[in-house]
Design a protein with these regions (language model features):
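Long, low-complexity, Lys/Arg-enriched
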Residues: 1-71, 88, 92-132
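Gly/Ser/Thr-rich loops at beta-strand to alpha-helix junctions
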Residues: 19-21, 75-84
C-alpha cells in the first residue's frame, strides 16, 4: 500500500457517505480503524435539479470542512458528480481518499405467484484508493 502517515495528518478516518459507521460490519470498522478513529460526516442530499455550479460549491464547502480536520483518510461515496468534485479537491490538498469495495451476494426466490424476489447483501472486502 502506498499510503503513509505523515506529521500533518490527524488520527481520524472520515466517513463521508450515506452509510453511518454504526451500521458497518465489524470487518469494515476494523479496516477503517487501521487509519484512525472513525468520524461520520453525513453525505449531503444532492437535488437532481442542482446545477453543476451548485454541486461544485457544495463540494468546496465540504472540502474546507474536511481539510480543517486533518484526516488520515476520507471515505467518500455517493452522488457521482459531487463525489468527483470533492475527491479532486481533497487529493489536490494531499488528502488520501478511498471508496469501499464490497462483494454483492444475491439470493433469488421464485414465489408461487410467479414473481421473483431478490435479496442483495453487500459484504465489505477492502478500501480502494482514489488516484485522480
Amino acid at each position: 500500500m502506498w499510503w503513509e502517515r505523515d506529521e500533518v495528518m490527524g488520527d481520524i478516518f472520515i466517513n463521508h457517505s450515506n452509510h453511518p459507521s454504526a451500521l458497518w460490519s465489524e470487518d469494515e470498522k476494523r479496516a477503517a480503524e487501521e487509519y484512525g478513529r472513525i468520524v461520520d460526516m453525513a453525505f449531503p442530499a444532492i437535488p437532481p435539479l442542482a446545477t453543476e455550479i451548485e454541486v461544485e460549491g457544495l463540494a468546496e464547502v465540504n472540502a474546507v470542512r474536511i481539510i480543517a480536520q486533518k484526516p488520515a483518510l476520507v471515505l467518500c461515496q455517493g452522488e457521482y458528480t459531487y463525489t468527483y468534485a470533492l475527491v479532486k479537491r481533497l487529493i489536490e490538498k494531499g488528502i488520501y481518499v478511498v471508496a469501499a469495495c464490497s462483494e454483492r451476494v444475491v439470493e433469488e426466490h421464485h414465489e408461487p405467484d410467479g414473481s421473483t424476489r431478490r435479496i442483495s447483501q453487500f459484504r465489505f472486502k477492502r478500501f480502494r484508493f482514489y488516484d485522480c
